């Protein structure tokens, strides 16, 4: 396993959207993450007042959550944090590495959304991240994760049109799955409205449900629920929301 892939420069180099936070912000504008997060909090911890979000990106979801909770956001990438501070100056957003960050505050809710956890590839470093989650929790605190729990194994090309501020872009996507490392690689080719082209290679670690359960339990979190966007009784993936309570 190759280790933590979330050093700021490599991540920006391999993901067009991280190199262009404004474009990321537009493309993520229809994200349902904040709404799902609020629903899960209402269900499992309706009296929550404080929240920390690891991997907050441009702060789009945090902006919604901050209407209800006192929030702090952390992200590893200075470009994302700079953009977030300019676009949403009312938010408390900081540069931080979720393997080692310590705010010296315990929060009612700890979140790690948008596949952030999937950029940590090494088992020991995943353990470090869960220790960070626990360091910011007290008895009764919620942990809410959104991460891949099953691989995308189809190898056929997929093409989509993405609206950008300068017009529609065409993106072609191919997935690869390495079972030994549990890494799903997504390769994207962008044809931009300007006529320019860009390439992406995004590598995400799939942490299967029973693995997630074990990582959480080792640091004191008990799993309450795992659900995907279908909200059905059967978990199908490939991405799931995991809710756990600190005991």
Task: Annotate the PLM regions.
Residues 127-139:
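A short glycine-rich, Lys/Arg-flanked "PGG" loop and its adjoining helix->strand segment in the class I
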Residues 59-100:
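Class I SAM-dependent methyltransferase SAM/SAH-binding core
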């Amino acid at each position: 396993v190759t280790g933590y892939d979330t050093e700021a420069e490599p991540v920006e180099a391999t993901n067009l959207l991280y190199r262009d936070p404004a474009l990321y912000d537009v493309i993520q504008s229809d994200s349902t993450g904040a709404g799902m997060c609020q629903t899960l909090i209402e269900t499992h911890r309706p009296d929550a007042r404080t929240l920390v979000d690891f991997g907050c990106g441009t702060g789009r979801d945090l902006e919604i959550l901050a209407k209800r909770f006192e929030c702090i956001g952390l992200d590893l990438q200075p470009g994302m944090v700079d953009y977030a501070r300019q676009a949403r100056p009312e938010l408390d957003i900081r540069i931080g590495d979720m393997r080692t960050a310590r705010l010296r505050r315990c929060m009612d809710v700890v979140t790690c959304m948008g596949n952030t956890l999937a950029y940590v590839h090494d088992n020991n470093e995943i353990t470090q991240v869960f220790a960070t989650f626990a360091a910011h929790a007290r008895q009764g605190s919620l942990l809410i994760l959104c991460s891949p729990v099953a691989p995308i194994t189809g190898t056929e090309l997929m093409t989509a049109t993405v609206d950008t501020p300068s017009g529609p872009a065409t993106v072609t996507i191919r997935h690869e799955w390495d079972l030994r490392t549990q890494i799903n690689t997504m390769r994207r080719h962008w044809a931009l409205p300007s006529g320019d082209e860009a390439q992406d290679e995004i590598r995400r670690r799939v942490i299967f449900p029973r693995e997630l359960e074990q990582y959480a339990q080792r640091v004191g979190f008990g799993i309450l629920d795992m659900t995907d966007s279908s909200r059905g009784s059967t978990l199908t993936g490939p991405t799931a929301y995991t809710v756990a309570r600190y005991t």
